[in-house]
């Protein structure tokens, strides 16, 4: 690992660069094969497993030959998402039932995204939305709400008034004047104030839920969005951009966070994932799970750690193509210099893979094979070194990243921001890249304010994760260098060789 960021530039005079640039605009058909278990579910087309055994593609890392950033030069924008068949439906049965791991597949669900009906895309100058517009009002008196209390947004005063009334079982003198309750008058008529609390939906039982009901959230967001659009028309353009990216995201990535979370929480009509926690359950899983990239008779003679590692490689290759397809739908991306498009994808794909991998993880394990299986964290750690070290940093990142409680609409913009990073080594024309990213950052900031009004620091926290992701990729490349030295019979997929070449 002697290279630095400055050493990792792509030589525009080299044959490798010519091959890379040629392949970026030409679809390369790859042979579909089978693989073991890749704990992500977003991808590129498959490549024959026999390539993995071809030692001409070993860790000696040959020149660029097979990058499949296909058809990047053809933009296509669609404002209406196309429904996809759910890839997780299978015609097999799961027999293994483990009480020890039932609790592992339980996490908090993620609320679906909210968007307005506007879909036109614009590129307007940035104007910061007024902070006052983002202040949510108390549903009872109109004062600034301090949070979601007893089922509605309420200020501290009305929250305390309602709590005292309920706990002390207070009964107020009846008033038939239907007094108006607002910030200055709320203490004048306790009867009408309590009736207003009940009328807007405050309930002592609602405290246990802790989260805003989705219908209430959508109504509130609609009110806020309408106010913002009237005073700041540019925000409507940013939300339209966010909707476009979300639609493209849904079409590009089969297993979304919403689907993954539904599986992990048992809130899906599909069968529960088969739990793989040791060698015996792994063997049973190979019989029960429809693995997409493995031919069992050919592969069972290989060591388990190597088979899983090869499966991860193939799933990564699939990921590159889906990320590439998504990138082509980011407004302005296909108009960039072709060489810069290659560079942005080369440096960005693995950061995005690990971002989306977090959606499939909880602290105990990860979904595999399009949600058909669940491989435990402890089993992955038990693989012999250095293979047992590969996934642990991803789990550590996922636990912290998932604590931000992002949904797919947030992730759609975030991964676009990752792709359009103007500080990647070797870029030829940085200015247009930074202009696109600036627009995406504005859309992300507004999206987070609308979708997470209670998390004022979320935007800053999310940007910090971009630094964490780069560190994870650097450590991953370092582990690959260890494998290169210790596993002389191992081979690395040709496409991944090209991406990893001179990468950090």
UniProtKB/Swiss-Prot annotation:
Major site of localization recorded for this protein: nucleus
Tissues with expression: Highest expression in adipose tissue and lower in spleen. Very low levels in kidney, intestine, lung and muscle.
Keyword Lipid biosynthesis recorded: no
Location of this chain's protein in the cell: Nucleus; Cytoplasm
Any matching Pfam family: Hormone_recep
Residues annotated to bind DNA: 135-209
Domain of life: Eukaryota
ZnF (NR C4-type) residues: 138-158, 175-197
Region (Interaction with FAM120B): 204-279
Keywords from the UniProt entry: Activator, Biological rhythms, Cytoplasm, DNA-binding, Isopeptide bond, Metal-binding, Nucleus, Phosphoprotein, Receptor, Transcription, Transcription regulation, Ubl conjugation, Zinc, Zinc-finger
Transmembrane annotation, as ranges: none
GO cellular component, one term: nucleus
Domain NR LBD: 237-502
PROSITE patterns attached to this UniProt entry: NR_LBD (PS51843), NUCLEAR_REC_DBD_1 (PS00031), NUCLEAR_REC_DBD_2 (PS51030)
Activity regulation summary: PDPK1 activates its transcriptional activity independently of its kinase activity.
Glycyl lysine isopeptide (Lys-Gly) (interchain with G-Cter in ubiquitin) crosslink site(s): 251
Domains (record comment): The 9aaTAD motif is a transactivation domain present in a large number of yeast and animal transcription factors.
Protein family (similarity comment): Belongs to the nuclear hormone receptor family. NR1 subfamily.
Subunit structure: Interacts with FOXO1 (acetylated form). Heterodimer with other nuclear receptors, such as RXRA. The heterodimer with the retinoic acid receptor RXRA is called adipocyte-specific transcription factor ARF6. Interacts with NCOA6 coactivator, leading to a strong increase in transcription of target genes. Interacts with coactivator PPARBP, leading to a mild increase in transcription of target genes. Interacts with NOCA7 in a ligand-inducible manner. Interacts with NCOA1 and NCOA2 LXXLL motifs. Interacts with ASXL1, ASXL2, DNTTIP2, FAM120B, MAP2K1/MEK1, NR0B2, PDPK1, PRDM16, PRMT2 and TGFB1I1.
Name this polypeptide is given: Peroxisome proliferator-activated receptor gamma
Species this chain originates from: Sus scrofa (Pig)
Highest classification ranks of the organism: Eukaryota, Metazoa, Chordata, Craniata, Vertebrata
Gene that this polypeptide is encoded by: PPARG
